[in-house]
Amino acid sequence: MDTKNVYKIFLIQTMKTVISLGGSLISLDNLDYIRNVAELIEKASQDFDLYVVVGGGKLARQYIKAARHFCNDERYLDKLGILATRLNAFLLASFFKKDIPETIEEAAKQETPVIMGGTTPGHSTDAVAAMLAKHINAYRLIIATDVDGIYDKDPKKHADAKKYDEISIEKLKEMIGKEWSRAGESVVIDAIACKIISKAKIKTFVLNGKNLQQLENAIYGKQFNGTVIVTK
């Protein structure tokens, strides 16, 4: 018996990984990044079952901002944002020539790598990623954003912001607050996602997805620059 192959099959079956890929990372102006992250997903999928949930980013915000001129229904506007996440997901999935699932249940049944966007109004793509991780009993959840992890305040606005290498889920929930309700809002991780991560005790990493080496390190369980969310 080839023990190396047996071990590899074991890894693929047990170390399912969900990645929440922030919409800020996916842009029509940065096709090289999209190709590079797709190649990383392709490579890592040989060793792990990968599920990638893509955010709406600038595209979602632009459409939601425009639609606010005609509508102030947050649930309706959120549907527009979901369509933007799916456009971004389709763009990434085009590398694999794959369709994207529209529900967590569909995603769980699809052959990996799975690429998807948002699902239902009121849930950010981070929340969708957390729900998917819980549904498939993923080994870990990686939140790839455009900052180096979780800070005590917004590092884009405060030069003295301090990054947490590790933070408890309880402290994180206190920092974030209880609600995420306005369509198009952008936060590192929202309250609904936090609640799911806390309840399901999902091993969660937050890092800068622009640095693909750090993302690869996190996928493969190596040391990375970011924040570990402690749920115990």
Predicted regions and their residues:
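Intrinsic disorder/low-complexity segments
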Residues: 1-3
